[in-house]
Structure formats: C-alpha cells, structure tokens
Amino acid sequence: MRSLVTLCMIALCTILQAQEANIPKVFTLGQSEKAYESLNQSYSKTLLEASNGDIKMAFDQWLLMMKEMDVYAERIDFDLNGVKLWLHVFWGANGKIDHMGYLLRSDSRNINDAELKAFFSSFMNRFTFPIKSDKPFNHYTGATFPTFSVKVNN
C-alpha cells in the first residue's frame, strides 16, 4: 500500500512538472489554463507566507521589485509609463522569478504584447527577489507603471 501511494505521488509530481514545462516563462493570463492551474499548485505558498506573515516586509519587497522594473525599463529605453495590468509572479524558493503571467487592464495604455513579454523575460533573468523560502511561492495583484509610493509615518 505504501509503495502504491509513493508511486502515485511520483506520477503526480511528474505530470505537474511536465505541465509546468509547457507554460512559457512569460505568458498572458487566460491562456493555457491547465498549465496555469499546475503552476498554482506547484507554487502554492503565497508571498505573505514566504514573508513569515510580515505584511510590511512582503509589501516593501514587492514595491522594490516594481521600482526595479521601472529602473530597468528606463535603462533599456523601454516605455512602461501608463501600463496597467494584473500580474502573477511565480518565484522559486531561491527568489528567482520562474514565471510571470499578466493581463493588461482595460484602462491601460496600449503596448506591443511581444515587446512587453520580451521586457518581462529580460527582467526576470536579471532580478532576484530578496525573499527566500523553503518552497516556491507566488503573488497576484494589480500593477501600474510608473510605480508611485509614499511612506506615511503614523
């Protein structure tokens, strides 16, 4: 019985890895739904959980990544200003971005889809998230560019 359970677990992991391998590193949300569901299962830990429940740290590190995207876009002369999207980021346990899914919001300015995918792909190859975890993790939220933030001291 124990070996049957082990065999089933190995088969499930193999199937999930195969499905994950079929999804591009950068993809449009709403495409490849089965592969996307597989990513959500493989990266089931949230950014907040990876931050040990510290919402301030999770938010600050997310904001840092958004600002790094702004800086990188400016450095390579890629105009992100006015882009508004839903963004789902999947990190490996080591903080490297493994996958990014996005969907432009209806109030976003138009941007070439292939160029945006190329930008995200290039960015994720250069950026490592400061938070590390015992398991892969993810975060899904809205993002707008440029990134504005103001610290308020209470």
What does each model-identified segment do?
Residues 19-154:
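Charge-biased low-complexity segments
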Residues 1-24:
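Bacterial Sec-dependent N-terminal signal peptides
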